[in-house]
A protein has these predicted regions:
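Domain-level signature for proteins that mediate thiol-based redox and metal-cofactor handling
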Residues: 1-187
Length: 187
């Protein structure tokens, strides 16, 4: 399922790939623990791979013709090969939940919240589970038509710049309940 911008596509498979965990690979060097991510990152234009439960999210550096990349074929071939999706070494030296919570809270307070405050918004860290980050947006960010762009291009990039091995970054915001969004969502 491609994103509206065409730079991200989610592939759901019929089995858990990483139950109760996630792994993010922003380049081939980071993908040494995942033969599948390494192969996907070797495809021209592929910028990152996120593996979580039964979904692979592949991001390109620009809008691409997803069917032409044949990523589904690569995934199917790998699933039948018997090779691990992500080796155990990926999870061996992840930062602790406490360290992640401290670092991300500090980042939100120091950089992210001052930036979104100009639009009347704020972002709060709700929880860390393993290496997954749960946030909530409020004020002008809640229900804002640009909230997804803010999350993906601002918040996510800042968090991954600080802690590259963070897994999923999940927005728990009830955007439909936003009372004063900075930009009205398009219908």
């Amino acid at each position: 399922e491609p994103s509206a911008q065409g730079d991200r596509c989610k592939y759901a498979v019929d089995r858990p790939l990483l139950p109760d965990a996630s792994a993010y690979f922003g380049d081939a060097a980071a993908a040494q623990a995942s033969p599948l991510a390494r192969e996907l990152l070797s495809i021209a234009g592929v910028e990152s791979v996120l593996i979580a439960d039964n979904v692979l999210t592949v991001t390109a550096s620009y809008a691409v013709d997803w069917p032409a990349l044949a990523i589904g074929n690569v995934i199917r071939k790998h699933l039948t090969s018997g090779s691990p999706i992500v080796g155990p070494e990926y999870f061996e030296d992840l930062p602790s939940e406490g360290d992640l919570k401290w670092a991300i809270s500090d980042l939100l307070n120091r950089e992210i919240n001052p930036a979104v405050a100009s639009h009347g918004g704020f972002v709060e860290l709700i929880d860390i589970k393993k290496n997954n980050v749960f946030i909530r947006m409020g004020g002008g960010c809640q229900g804002c038509g640009a909230a997804d762009v803010t999350l993906r291009q601002g918040i996510e990039k800042a968090i991954r710049g600080l802690v590259p091995r963070v897994g999923e970054i999940l927005d728990t915001t009830d955007h439909a309940a936003g009372r004063n969004p900075y930009y009205s969502p398009s219908k």
